């Protein structure tokens, strides 16, 4: 049996079209022995963070068990403007686009995919978020491209009988992506005569596949087998059919409504080997793509602007001279009284989460200035001699804010609140949530 992974998968984030939940997909892939999988929702990347997080959770357990990590591949099935320019919004032809599967090969590719999808929504939206050849070429680095389903540019041109145009398109894609461009073949044969399903798709797929295989050989492009997954298990087909009725606003018994083949479930490796028994290389090429893809972290630390602290209070450089990294480590891993220190290993994890020891200098500097302002305000509100209760509460809150990395955020918020009150004449309420009960915020 040839190894195989799914590279064309729609989750429930393909709104009113995909029905599969990410955890169920990943769990099924792992239970079937797959080494990874892609998520390629229609026109969006809404599910990518959930996909990353769930795989990270699963891989944490797998690491403890001594197992290889399961590899997530981040992608999108994009719409490519049919007339070559995503800014065109004039005729019906502009309302959708050719389907194209775009996979991130590495972190650079992921960043480029984000740009492509964002620009498709912001600049190319016309019934669908559309990209175009110009953007694809501009942001091509680090991407792997596949020709998609019958809605793709190559299959559409083949079905229209324009083989030379299909060849030109293949040459264009291959010219940019080289060995990272693949042609897709799909086979959605309905075998149950009692099942109400679309039987025309398979006939079209067979005709298109024959030409694709010929063109692939002629132009030196590898072929991959995919299943255009929209639901997890075979017995989910009827529920998915109901979802399509909701999507198209049609009754179940409407004889004219859209039907899928009901073959679009997340098939096992064995099932895919059965469907493509005569094309083992198309199955094997999916794992070639899997092996090309690098793993990388989607998480990043919050990026906050620096609040300009007056120089007469001090500078960050002075704080660096005044405190050692060990001073800061103790301060950030103990309570507000400098007592009850965390175990070293736990403390190191906390510091790493804040951005590392070097970042602590900035946080400490901002925290001390926030404390300076808080005590200034407290003396105006409560008098020069603060009660122990007020002082303890201020110190406790300031310590919590500091050890969570929030002082800069509080300084920025108080700055625009003061501007709203004192300069712009904007009414400002007491706030909401836990901050409304904070003595420091008060």
PLM regions and their residue ranges:
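Phosphodiester-processing cores and adjacent nucleic acid-binding clamps
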Residues: 1-442
């Amino acid at each position: 049996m040839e190894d195989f992974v799914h590279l064309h998968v729609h989750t429930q984030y393909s709104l009113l079209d995909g029905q599969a939940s990410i955890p169920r997909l990943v769990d099924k892939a792992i239970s079937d022995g797959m080494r990874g999988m892609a998520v390629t929702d229609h026109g969006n990347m809404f599910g990518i963070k959930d996909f990353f997080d769930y795989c990270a959770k699963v891989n944490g357990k797998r690491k403890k068990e001594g197992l290889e990590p399961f590899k997530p591949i981040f992608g999108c099935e994009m719409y490519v403007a049919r007339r070559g320019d995503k800014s065109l919004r004039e005729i019906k032809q502009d309302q959708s686009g050719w389907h194209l599967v775009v996979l991130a090969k590495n972190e650079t590719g992921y960043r480029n995919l984000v740009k492509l999808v964002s620009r498709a929504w912001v600049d190319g939206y016309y019934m669908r978020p559309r990209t175009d050849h110009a953007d694809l070429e501009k942001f091509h680095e680090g991407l792997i491209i596949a020709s998609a389903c019958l809605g793709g540019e190559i299959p559409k041109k083949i079905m229209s009988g324009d083989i030379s145009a299909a060849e030109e398109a293949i040459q264009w894609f291959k010219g940019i992506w080289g060995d990272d461009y693949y042609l897709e073949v799909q086979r959605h044969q309905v075998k149950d005569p009692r099942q109400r399903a679309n039987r025309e798709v398979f006939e079209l797929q067979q005709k298109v596949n024959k030409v694709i295989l010929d063109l692939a050989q002629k132009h030196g492009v590898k072929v991959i087998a995919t299943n255009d997954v929209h639901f997890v298990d075979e017995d989910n087909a009827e529920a998915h059919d109901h979802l399509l009725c909701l999507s198209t606003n049609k009754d179940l018994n409407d004889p004219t409504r859209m039907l899928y083949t009901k073959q679009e479930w997340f098939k096992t490796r064995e099932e895919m080997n059965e469907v493509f028994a005569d094309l083992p290389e198309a199955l094997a090429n999916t794992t070639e793509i899997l092996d090309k893809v690098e793993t990388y972290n989607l998480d990043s630390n919050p990026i906050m602007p620096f609040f300009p602290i007056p120089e007469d209070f001090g500078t960050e450089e002075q704080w660096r001279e005044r405190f050692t990294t060990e001073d800061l480590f103790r301060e950030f891993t103990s309570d507000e009284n400098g007592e009850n220190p965390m175990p070293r290993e736990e403390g190191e994890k906390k510091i790493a989460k804040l951005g590392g020891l070097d970042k602590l200098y900035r946080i400490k500097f901002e925290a001390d200035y926030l404390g300076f302002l808080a005590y200034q305000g407290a003396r105006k509100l409560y008098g020069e001699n603060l009660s122990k209760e007020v002082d303890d509460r201020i110190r406790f809150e300031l310590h919590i804010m500091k050890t969570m990395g929030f002082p800069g955020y509080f300084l920025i918020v108080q700055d625009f609140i003061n501007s709203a009150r004192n300069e712009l004449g904007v009414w400002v309420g007491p706030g909401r949530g836990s901050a409304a009960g904070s003595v420091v915020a008060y």
